[in-house]
């Protein structure tokens, strides 16, 4: 991937932009504006954007759990769906959380995705004020 800006083209649930046409339009505008890649959520969006842009697509699937926590591509199942949709890269969660996967589990998930897909993997990590997790 070239050096430059990567634009995340996503819309929250309930947003009037949360539809394939809007996500494709956002990605095309990001490319027109000079983005070197776009970050796209959801298999249908990934597939549609891949057909319309000539820059790399970083694919992810957000899974919201009953705890309210959101995980980015939390398992090989989602990673395989992203790969099949044509993403150039897979973004996967490696964030440690007390109530879910540990950092070690996150890294294992990343390794598994790397080994079982043919697409480069980008680790998504975020930490709040309660770091370090024990």
Question: What do the predicted segments below correspond to?
Answer:
Residues 1-134:
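Alpha/beta enzyme core
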């Amino acid at each position: 991937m070239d050096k430059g800006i990567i634009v995340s083209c996503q819309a929250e649930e309930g947003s009037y932009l949360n539809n394939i046409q809007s996500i494709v339009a956002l990605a095309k505008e990001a490319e027109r504006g000079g983005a070197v890649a776009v970050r796209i959520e959801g298999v249908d969006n990934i597939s549609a954007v891949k057909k319309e842009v000539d820059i790399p697509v970083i694919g992810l699937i957000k899974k919201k759990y009953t705890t309210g926590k959101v995980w980015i591509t939390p398992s090989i199942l989602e990673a395989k769906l992203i790969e099949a949709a044509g993403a150039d890269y897979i973004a996967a969660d490696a964030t440690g959380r007390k109530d879910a996967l540990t950092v070690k589990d996150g890294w294992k998930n990343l390794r598994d995705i790397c080994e079982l897909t043919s697409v480069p993997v980008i680790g998504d990590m975020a930490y709040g004020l309660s770091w370090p997790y024990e």
